[in-house]
Amino acid sequence: DAQEKRQPWIPFV
């Protein structure tokens, strides 16, 4: 959850 926000990578849209 917060991990995705921490990583400045492109999320799976």
UniProtKB/Swiss-Prot annotation:
It is found in: Secreted. GO terms for cellular component: extracellular region. Coiled coil: none annotated. Expressed by the skin dorsal glands. GO terms for biological process: defense response. Keywords: Amidation, Amphibian defense peptide, Secreted. The modification Valine amide is found at V13. Belongs to the frog skin active peptide (FSAP) family. Peroniin subfamily. This is Peroniin-1.2a. It comes from Litoria peronii (Emerald spotted tree frog).
